[in-house]
């Protein structure tokens, strides 16, 4: 089926499985619609590898994947490969169709905080190979970004004031997360926001909250102390840091904060349980980079906290935000170009992703901020983009998870049918049809609207609990 032999234990014994970084070709980047920033095309230098980019994640120098060594039988199209040229992801013509082969343990990786390939390959298989409709993970299939500001210390106060004067907060909504204690790097350093005794910051957060921005917790009371020292065994010492931060932020905005980000991405499992017990909806995550809102596995098991969604960061190679650009010897133009590509990507693919930054770094990245504003303005004018906040998307994802739907057919007349239902409402749930494979799409039960978007049809459900749609499949 796959055009090669693999699992050659009798022949290779202990060498049956190899380990290597994974590389995608320029063609694969387009074919699989790999997210900007996930591939590093400069990792392997020039020569035969110049058109192959290494798959990356945040902070790790390399991602090393286990894979079977293979023996070719017939020609295949290699989309991803290992350093020794072993196909990692390939397609093979078989009969009147094609077979997609993934030579990595996708499910195993999902349970260990690296599920990008699993999600991307399943999406590609369903939409591009089987050519079936898919249920969008955004309301009305509207692409967008969660722009997450991490306010770690009092070094952010003047940059925030400058952003406000420049009209930055007139757009959005954004998700602004605050570390509220009096210290930042170490105890008694006086570098924190000291939110309970900081009238300016209190007034600023109240203004942004009233304007529709989402205000949340960034840990942890003392940013670096919590970020460096909290671990699985010291809940009794550090849970009060979460309590104090939560009380301070919630008191300031006049309602309970519902979204969270961990200082330095440090999130012990007890902190996730604390979020669930306090009724939080979402948290920023440095795991599963490249995904939208997802249910992360914890210690190899699915999260037991219903309704709580992880929002992975969007990595740019091995970094995630402005502060790290100079550390990696990069130029501002590199991350500016990445953000422009990311904005275009989410808009075209009807997806939501998170990008975060520290306001304290913004004085050094004014051109990047200008690019974000101008690019967003252009995409909004085209009806292709919107800003999201974490709580809003979490509510949507919980409703989406409640949707039950299936595809029937084709029958003798070549008709296929989607039957969908929800215990509440299907409002804004959207099915995306490849236009070249579906025609005469019509709603036979329930409410909805149909519109064409480039080479796709978007079927947006109305406020009814059930929906049936028929269409003629194009061979």
Predicted regions: what is each one?
Residues 427-429, 452-475:
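C-terminal beta-strand-rich structural cap/linker in extracellular carbohydrate-active enzymes
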Residues 2-77, 83, 424:
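An acidic, glycine-rich "communication" segment
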Residues 106, 144-152, 313-392:
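Catalytic grooves of carbohydrate-active enzymes
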Residues 380, 431-447:
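Solvent-exposed beta-hairpin/edge-strand motifs
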Residues 84-93, 342-344:
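Short, surface-exposed beta-strand/loop micro-motifs that present aromatic residues
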Residues 86, 93-149, 153-162, 366-402:
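Extracellular ligand-binding/catalytic regions of CAZymes and related secreted enzymes
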Residues 391-435:
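Surface beta-strand/loop "capping" patches
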Residues 2-18, 168-272, 281, 286-296, ...:
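Metal-dependent polysaccharide deacetylase catalytic core of the NodB/CE4 family, i.e.
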């Amino acid at each position: 089926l796959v055009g090669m032999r693999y699992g050659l234990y009798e022949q290779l014994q202990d060498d049956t499985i190899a380990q290597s970084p994974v590389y995608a070709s320029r063609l694969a980047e387009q074919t699989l619609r790999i997210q900007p920033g996930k591939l590093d095309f400069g990792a392997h230098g020039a020569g035969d590898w110049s058109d192959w980019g290494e798959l990356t994640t945040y902070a790790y120098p390399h991602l090393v994947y286990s894979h079977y060594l293979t023996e070719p039988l017939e020609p295949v199209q290699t989309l991803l490969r290992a350093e020794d040229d072993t196909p990692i992801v390939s397609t093979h013509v078989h009969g009147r169709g094609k077979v997609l082969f993934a030579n990595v343990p996708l499910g195993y990786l999902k349970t260990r905080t690296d599920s990008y390939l699993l999600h991307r390959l399943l999406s590609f298989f369903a939409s591009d190979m089987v050519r079936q409709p898919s249920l969008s993970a955004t309301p009305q299939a509207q692409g967008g970004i969660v722009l997450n500001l991490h306010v770690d210390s009092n070094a952010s106060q003047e940059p925030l004031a400058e952003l406000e004067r420049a009209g930055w907060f007139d757009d959005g909504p954004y998700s602004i997360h605050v570390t509220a204690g009096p210290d930042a790097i170490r105890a008694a350093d006086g570098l924190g926001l000291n939110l309970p005794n900081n009238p300016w910051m209190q007034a600023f957060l109240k203004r942004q909250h009233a304007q529709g921005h989402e205000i949340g917790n960034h840990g942890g009371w003392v940013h670096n102390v919590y970020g460096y020292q909290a671990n699985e065994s010291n809940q009794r010492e550090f849970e009060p840091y979460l309590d104090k931060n939560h009380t301070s932020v919630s008191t300031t905005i006049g309602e309970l904060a519902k979204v969270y980000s961990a200082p330095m991405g440090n999130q012990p499992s007890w902190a996730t349980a604390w979020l669930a017990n306090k009724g939080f909806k979402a948290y920023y995550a440095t795991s599963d980079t490249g995904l939208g809102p997802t249910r992360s596995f914890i210690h190899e098991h699915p999260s037991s906290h219903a309704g709580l969604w992880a929002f992975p960061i969007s990595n740019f190679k091995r970094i995630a935000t402005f502060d790290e650009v100079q550390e990696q010897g990069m130029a501002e133009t590199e991350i500016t170009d990445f953000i422009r590509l990311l904005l275009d990507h989410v808009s075209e693919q009807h997806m939501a992703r998170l990008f975060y930054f520290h306001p304290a770094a913004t004085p050094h990245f004014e051109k990047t901020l200008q690019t974000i504003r101008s690019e967003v303005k252009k995409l909004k004018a085209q009806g292709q983009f919107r800003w999201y906040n974490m709580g809003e998307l979490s509510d949507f994802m919980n409703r989406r998870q409640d949707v039950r739907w299936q595809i029937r057919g084709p029958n003798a007349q070549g008709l296929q049918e989607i039957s969908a239902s929800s215990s509440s409402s299907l409002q804004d749930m959207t099915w995306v049809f490849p236009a070249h494979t579906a025609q005469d799409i019509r709603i036979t039960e329930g409410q909805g609207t149909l519109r064409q978007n480039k080479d796709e049809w978007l079927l947006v459900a109305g406020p009814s609990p059930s929906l049936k749609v028929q269409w003629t499949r194009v061979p």
